[in-house]
């Protein structure tokens, strides 16, 4: 394997015994196969056992053997909680191989996305708002053609999202007051803030008008957007709620339609 992939040689070291056989045998391969070729090892991978403890011992063994640049990868059904705990324990891990828990979330194994009718286009080009009634207020749909705006503070941190009618423009020069669409008595006024429209047309008149970004661009954009969230929102335990509110105009339209349909 090392002879075939000398520039990308990552060896699994936990098949039998990590510290007694795995790491020593990997070092032997590095010495006897890669070194004569003038190549440096890419890394080793630990897929079982006490990864925090084993990675510290493996790091020491690799350093003493003259391979401080050899990385250590950890795998074995990792999720964000295990990764966090490994970091807190000071594990000497350079990268984490996350498989099934990234492609299928334990808490939400099925993405519950459903299309719901929001408006009907009439013959004259106008739109008639539509919504679904439900016994649960949270499950009632939001009618009309809409836009989504993100409100940022003066430091560029995201404070809340605001859903508006498609023809609305969010002005923030004099501050903006948002309220919870369910518990309407809960409101908050933001000053020294800015608003950015998140809605981007993908298709117009049946034709695609959006150029798909590269995977690298998607990754950079996602990382940048997550960086705008407060740490209190991103923490695992008891995170702060990130609010998504409705504009007054949209909330009034929804309430009027709800009263009409409930008669």
Predicted segments with their positions:
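Buried, small/hydrophobic-residue-enriched core segments of structured protein domains
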Residues: 1-68, 78-82, 88, 104, ...
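Gly/Ser/Thr/Ala-enriched C-terminal appendages of enzymes
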Residues: 60-65, 70, 78-263
């Amino acid at each position: 394997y090392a002879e075939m992939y000398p520039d990308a040689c990552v060896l699994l070291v936990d098949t039998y015994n990590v510290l007694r056989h795995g790491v020593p045998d990997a070092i032997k391969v590095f010495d006897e196969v890669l070194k004569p070729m003038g190549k440096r090892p890419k890394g080793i991978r630990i897929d079982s056992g006490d990864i925090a403890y084993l990675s510290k011992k493996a790091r020491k063994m690799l350093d003493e053997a003259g391979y401080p640049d050899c990385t250590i990868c950890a795998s074995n059904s990792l999720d964000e909680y295990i990764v966090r705990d490994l970091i807190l324990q000071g594990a000497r891990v350079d990268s984490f191989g996350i498989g099934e828990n990234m492609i299928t979330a334990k808490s939400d194994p099925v993405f519950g996305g459903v299309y719901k009718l929001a408006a009907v286009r009439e013959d004259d080009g106008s739109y008639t708002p539509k919504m679904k009634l439900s016994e649960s207020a949270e499950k009632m749909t939001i009618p009309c053609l809409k836009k989504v705006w993100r409100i940022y503070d003066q430091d560029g941190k995201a404070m809340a999202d605001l859903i508006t009618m498609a023809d609305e423009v969010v002005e923030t020069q004099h501050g903006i007051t948002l309220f919870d669409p369910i518990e309407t008595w809960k409101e908050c006024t933001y000053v020294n803030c800015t608003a950015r429209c998140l809605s981007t047309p993908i298709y117009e008149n049946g034709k695609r008008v959006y150029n798909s970004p590269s995977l690298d661009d998607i990754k950079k954009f996602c990382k940048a957007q997550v960086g705008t969230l407060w740490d209190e929102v991103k923490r695992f335990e008891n995170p702060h709620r990130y609010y998504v509110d409705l504009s007054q105009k949209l909330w009034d339209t929804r309430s009027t339609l709800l009263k009409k349909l409930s008669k």
